[in-house]
Amino acid sequence: MTLHYDGPTLTLVVNPAAGGGRARRVLPQVTRDLLIGLPGASLRVFQTGSFAEARLRCIAAAEQARPAVEGTMADSLLVMGGDGMMHLGLNACARTQVPLGLIPAGTGNDFCGGLGIHGGTPGAVRTIVSGATARIDLTSVRGKLAGGA
């Protein structure tokens, strides 16, 4: 049997209203930087119109992700927006091996700041392209997962 690897699929779920519309404005540059920085990757982008849609897109991406095989990058879920999007991505990828990329584009971006993700949206994209990863501890609060460094 021959296995063919087409490269990883990155699913980017975006809250375009985050940061007063900032996420929508920077999305073209984010997608360019991801595609240039990860030339073998496929990028699927979903601009969501509601919390429910964003949640479903995150869950679907995590469920459909292919794991890494020797010498390759795994399919990944990327979320872009404010702390609410970070929370959705975290809950979708928890208890899986699916890598989660966080791209802050909200107003405060407290979650990313607490994890040491600095440099705003461009810095987060550079970190994703570099392949840097970190595991974080999770706790459950009223049935929902929360993460921290």
Question: PLM features: residue spans?
Answer:
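ATP/NTP phosphate-donor binding region
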Residues: M1-L77, H87, G123-R126
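Glycine-rich beta-strand-to-loop/alpha-helix junction loops that act as flexible
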Residues: P16, M80-G82, I103-A105
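Short amphipathic alpha-helical segments
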Residues: R24-V26, G89-C93, G113-L115
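Conserved beta-strand-loop-alpha-helix hinge of the TIR/SEFIR fold
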Residues: S76-T96
